[in-house]
Amino acid sequence: MKHLHIIDSHTGGEPTRVVVSGFPPLGDGPMAERLAALARDHDRYRTACILEPRGSDVLVGALLCEPVSAGAAAGVIFFNNAGYLGMCGHGTIGLVRTLHHMGRIAPGVHRIETPVGDVEATLHDDLSVSVRNVLAYRHAKDVVVEVPGHGSVTGDVAWGGNWFFLVSDHGQRIAGENVAALAAYASAVRAGLERAGVTGRDGAPIDHIELFADDPEHDSRSFVLCPGHAYDRSPCGTGTSAKLACLAADGKLAPGAAWRQASVIGSVFSASYERAESGVVPTIRGSAHLSAEATLLIEDDDPFGWGIVS
């Protein structure tokens, strides 16, 4: 029998499952190398942790790793039901809150190593977390794709730690009771991008679709379709970062100015950015709450011990 020690939290409604122990050794190299080793040699640990019967499509996993640098608080590898994520904003907030719960960090500034670079996370006295993300930038503006049943859809391609297609003119109602229709629409847009061969830099697949609308109380409200067809309950940290990159490129938001991004369920991130040579460096602030601490058990004779894999 195998044992996986996990701590669950949610950030604005979006769950994060931090794996404290139980995964196999992945070496002591950079997080990108360890991610590759996990995906290549031990992917069944991801499926056991994230897929049913122990997990769900909405869950994001965060494998806690020893960092390469002695000056970093932790290393992390993010994953979900579809595979692996280079970076995860809500997951980083959940990880930092979990590290505090474990007694490993106190309020202050901490460095977290991820597969796409180091991020700076500040744990505030009220236990909210600010994440200074990796570089974000717009890759392409006003990209037009044909979406069957919806006609032409125009959006921007941007990087915020993951690849996004951001759409404002979509005609959809962004509300919690409309998520099924939103997911179907966003999925059709993603399929349209694939058919048209629209990608991120170096042919990277665009696996996140982000829809925006006006919000009466905040700067914007969004719906984000993640890889694997689950939607983000939080405002999406990497998606908000990609949005800031587009706003900055269009001259619609000044450096240091606050942007309040609401999610489809109403949770909120506060964000701002600093200019950089080839894009912007975003900072996202939000809060996570602990929800469970447990040991997942994998019995040797369990036919679904490694998850229900379709």
Swiss-Prot record:
- Coiled-coil portions: none
- As recorded in UniProt, its EC number(s) are 5.1.1.8
Task: Kindly indicate whether the keyword Isomerase belongs to this entry.
Answer: yes
Active-site annotation: 88, 236
| InterPro entries linked to this entry | Pro_racemase_fam
**Catalytic class of the enzyme:** isomerase
Annotated keywords: Isomerase
Q: Which domain of life is it from?
A: Bacteria
* Molecular-function annotations in GO: 4-hydroxyproline epimerase activity
Task: List the catalytic activities from the record.
Answer: trans-4-hydroxy-L-proline = cis-4-hydroxy-D-proline
- Short name of one Pfam family for this protein? Pro_racemase
Give the residues the record marks as binding substrate: 89-90, 208, 232, 237-238
Q: Which NCBIfam families match?
A: PRK13970.1
Q: Which family does it belong to?
A: Belongs to the proline racemase family.
User: What functional role does this protein have?
Assistant: Catalyzes the epimerization of trans-4-hydroxy-L-proline (t4LHyp) to cis-4-hydroxy-D-proline (c4DHyp). Is likely involved in a degradation pathway that converts t4LHyp to alpha-ketoglutarate. Can also catalyze the dehydration of trans-3-hydroxy-L-proline (t3LHyp) to Delta(1)-pyrroline-2-carboxylate (Pyr2C), albeit with 42-fold lower efficiency. Displays no proline racemase activity.
Kindly provide the name given to this protein in its UniProt entry. Answer: 4-hydroxyproline 2-epimerase
Please tell me the species this chain comes from.
Burkholderia thailandensis (strain ATCC 700388 / DSM 13276 / CCUG 48851 / CIP 106301 / E264)
